[in-house]
């Protein structure tokens, strides 16, 4: 009895082991193999976003190809085009496109002196200032009641000397710069009281840039950069710096972004001390700060004009495409633009009235017919 039970147990044990072995052999064949776990691909090296260069196409402002007072060989623009070859509208990275520029965004500073209030300034108020009164500020050296009534708070008495010296010129430029920063406007443009400003072409030119860019545009009066002593070394020797500058007699413009960077050398009277250190007049000191210290290049433009150049070569319709014009001094009174005007030379010796009537024929004092 015991032996038969023992044999039965052994048989059951062997059958159990055999069944388990069979199940183990059959189980892998009955199921598909598990899919291997996929790993995410390794991240490649991060690529920086492209740098947004604050640079208009081809330096954007046409190079000066003219003679005489132009920056021969120094122009950085596109030959044969009176305007930038493409309009760059750059905003901050990831931001919206740059807003369109309006005339109200431009701060136009006119530098003058007491003796020209009745002559030069009167002509400007009669012509182009009448089309940009809200944007134009008169910087003078004397409290003129009549001018105050005409210009209101847009007449700024700088309390600078009326003498035509380096110190007096830099004093006025210092006040111009500070007033521009206070204004909050996007562009600073300086002109003299013998300049005609075409607001339309000025707006068109500056619209090619963003005011947050570093932009310094104007016309040199020399065909080469100038050199100024920069620092005095411990051994008494001086280091010098070469730079271009835009002549104030033709006018120039500076973006707000660049003007803010000039602040350590230009704001709150620092402009005067900077000018004294390098012993340069106002427009040269502007160029020294921008090109010499901040290393921002002047954009040479042939659209700005001073009395130092041969203005008679500007003729016909091309006169109306310029940003600024000027006229010769009394010793060179025939140095004026050649425009088929509505006034004769005796009535309009500067040609500003004729230019203005061609641009704005609806002006009330413009005659209906051109003079032959």
Curated annotation (Swiss-Prot):
Statement: the UniProt record of this protein carries the keyword Glycosyltransferase: yes
Signal peptide stretch: none
Leading EC class: transferase
Compositionally biased intervals (Gly residues): 64-78
GO molecular function terms listed in the Swiss-Prot or TrEMBL record: metal ion binding; O-fucosylpeptide 3-beta-N-acetylglucosaminyltransferase activity
Membrane topology according to the record: Single-pass type II membrane protein
Cofactor mode of binding and number, as noted: Has some activity with cobalt but not with magnesium, calcium and zinc.
Residue segments, region Disordered: 30-96
GO process terms (BP): cell differentiation; nervous system development; pattern specification process; regulation of Notch signaling pathway
Entry's localization field: Golgi apparatus membrane
EC number: 2.4.1.222
GO cellular component: Golgi membrane
Domain of life the protein comes from: Eukaryota
Positions annotated with a glycan in the UniProt record: 159
Residue ranges, Cytoplasmic side: 1-10
Reactions catalysed according to its record: 3-O-(alpha-L-fucosyl)-L-threonyl-[EGF-like domain protein] + UDP-N-acetyl-alpha-D-glucosamine = 3-O-(N-acetyl-beta-D-glucosaminyl-(1->3)-alpha-L-fucosyl)-L-threonyl-[EGF-like domain protein] + UDP + H(+); 3-O-(alpha-L-fucosyl)-L-seryl-[EGF-like domain protein] + UDP-N-acetyl-alpha-D-glucosamine = 3-O-(N-acetyl-beta-D-glucosaminyl-(1->3)-alpha-L-fucosyl)-L-seryl-[EGF-like domain protein] + UDP + H(+)
Function recorded in the entry: Glycosyltransferase that initiates the elongation of O-linked fucose residues attached to EGF-like repeats in the extracellular domain of Notch molecules. Plays an important role in limb outgrowth, it directs the formation and positioning of the apical ectodermal ridge (AER), one of the key organizer centers of vertebrate limb development.
Designated name of the protein: Beta-1,3-N-acetylglucosaminyltransferase radical fringe
Encoding gene, per UniProt annotation: RFNG
């Amino acid at each position: 009895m015991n032996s038969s039970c023992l044999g039965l147990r052994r048989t059951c044990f062997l059958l159990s082991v055999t069944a388990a072995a069979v199940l183990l052999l059959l189980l892998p064949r009955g199921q598909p193999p598990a899919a291997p776990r996929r790993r995410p691909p390794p991240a490649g090296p991060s690529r920086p976003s492209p740098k947004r260069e604050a640079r208009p196409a081809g330096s954007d402002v046409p190079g000066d190809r003219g003679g005489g007072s132009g920056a021969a060989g120094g122009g950085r623009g596109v030959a044969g085009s009176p305007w930038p070859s493409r309009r760059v509208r750059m905003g901050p990275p990831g931001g919206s496109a740059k807003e369109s520029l309006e005339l109200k965004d431009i701060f136009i500073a006119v530098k003058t002196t007491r003796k020209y209030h009745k002559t030069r300034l009167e002509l400007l108020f009669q012509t182009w200032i009448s089309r940009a009164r809200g944007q134009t500020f008169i910087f003078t050296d004397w409290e003129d009641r009549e001018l105050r009534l005409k210009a209101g708070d847009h007449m700024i008495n700088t309390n600078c000397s009326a003498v035509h010296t380096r110190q007096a010129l830099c004093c006025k430029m210092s006040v111009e710069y500070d007033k521009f920063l206070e204004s909050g406007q996007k562009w600073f443009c300086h002109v003299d009281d013998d300049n005609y400003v075409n607001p339309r072409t000025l707006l068109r030119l500056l619209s090619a840039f963003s005011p947050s860019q570093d932009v310094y545009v104007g016309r040199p009066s020399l065909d080469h950069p100038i050199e100024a002593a920069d620092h005095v070394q411990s051994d008494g020797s001086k280091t010098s710096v070469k730079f271009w500058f835009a002549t104030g007699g033709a006018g120039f413009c500076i973006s707000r972004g660049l003007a803010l960077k000039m602040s350590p050398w230009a704001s709150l009277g620092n402009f005067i001390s900077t000018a004294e250190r390098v012993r340069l007049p106002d427009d040269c000191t502007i160029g020294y700060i921008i090109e010499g210290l901040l290393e921002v290049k002047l954009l040479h433009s042939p659209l700005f004009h001073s009395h130092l150049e041969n203005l008679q070569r500007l003729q016909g319709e091309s006169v109306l495409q310029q940003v600024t014009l000027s006229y010769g001094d009394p010793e060179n009174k025939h140095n004026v633009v050649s425009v088929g005007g509505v006034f004769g030379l005796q009535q309009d010796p500067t040609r500003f009235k004729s230019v203005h009537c061609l641009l704005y024929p609806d002006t009330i004092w413009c005659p209906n017919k051109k003079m032959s």
